[in-house]
Amino acid sequence: MTTAHRPQFDPARGHSEMAPTRITSSRALPAHLKLKYRQESQGTEEEVRKQDLREALLRAEAAHFATQEHGASSEEVSQNSKLIEGFTSPSTDDKPNNDVEVDYQELLRQTLEADEDASDSDDSVDSSNKNSEVSIKRRKTESNSQESVDSSNSESSDEESDSEDETQQLLRELENIKQERKREQMLQEEKNRALEQEKREREIAFGNELLNKASSGSFQVKRRWDEDVVFRNTHKGVDDTPRPGFVNDMLRSEFHKKFLARFVD
């Protein structure tokens, strides 16, 4: 009997290897052993600190407004760019530059006014075109409505008389249909009530088996519960006499029994 299933008081523990030599693949070795730092022109902290984000934003805004201006001349765009280029941030220079003074509010106001003038001109052209189209459409609709009124006045009298006759006829037909449906519904309800009453009377008369002994006969079970099974009465017609067979015992064999019956009284 095995004892592998029994718990051990001293479980197996790993031991030091006697031959620690191993062959390690180069792919299993660590690839990067030193921490890498950002080099110049790779977005170091000093470079980010020296960037003038305000100047870049103003350049981008000026370029955008210059492209949006429809009637802006090249002189105005160049003047705006020169004003932006002349700006120097106080963080980069130790002394403020008094020679070049830029009014950024004035610059933004000029660009916004130019943009608004262009949009107003476009809106005025569009509104004038729309007004002309609306006036033409209004004239056409007025002429068509006048013609339709003249023709409808002549036909309205005939149509009113015909429509009144048709509505009266339709109302009469609708009333007849409602009456027929109501009669059919009443007949169906009476028929259903008669059937339910007949069914109820039959259940009352023949529903109780104890009161209907004559009709039901006796309460004896006519069929057995295992009458329709597959292997029922399989032992019928089978010979119960023992068949001669081989017995591994000379004293109980058929030959020994016959021998004793013949020679021994």
UniProtKB/Swiss-Prot annotation:
It comes from the Eukaryota. Residues 1-31, 62-197 are annotated as: Disordered. GO terms for cellular component: catalytic step 2 spliceosome; nucleus; post-mRNA release spliceosomal complex; Prp19 complex; spliceosomal complex. The keyword Nucleus applies. Residues 155-205 form a coiled coil. One of its GO terms (molecular function) is RNA binding. InterPro entries: Cwf_Cwc_15 (IPR006973). Residues 113-125, 156-167 have a biased composition (Acidic residues). One of its GO terms (biological process) is mRNA cis splicing, via spliceosome. Keywords: Coiled coil, mRNA processing, mRNA splicing, Nucleus, Spliceosome. Residues 172-197 have a biased composition (Basic and acidic residues). Residues 143-155 have a biased composition (Low complexity). It is found in: Nucleus. PANTHER family: CELL CYCLE CONTROL PROTEIN CWF15 (PTHR12718), SPLICEOSOME-ASSOCIATED PROTEIN CWC15 HOMOLOG (PTHR12718:SF2). Belongs to the CWC15 family. Involved in pre-mRNA splicing. Belongs to the 40S cdc5-associated complex (or cwf complex), a spliceosome sub-complex reminiscent of a late-stage spliceosome composed of the U2, U5 and U6 snRNAs and at least brr2, cdc5, cwf2/prp3, cwf3/syf1, cwf4/syf3, cwf5/ecm2, spp42/cwf6, cwf7/spf27, cwf8, cwf9, cwf10, cwf11, cwf12, prp45/cwf13, cwf14, cwf15, cwf16, cwf17, cwf18, cwf19, cwf20, cwf21, cwf22, cwf23, cwf24, cwf25, cwf26, cyp7/cwf27, cwf28, cwf29/ist3, lea1, msl1, prp5/cwf1, prp10, prp12/sap130, prp17, prp22, sap61, sap62, sap114, sap145, slu7, smb1, smd1, smd3, smf1, smg1 and syf2. This is Pre-mRNA-splicing factor cwf15. It comes from Schizosaccharomyces pombe (strain 972 / ATCC 24843) (Fission yeast).
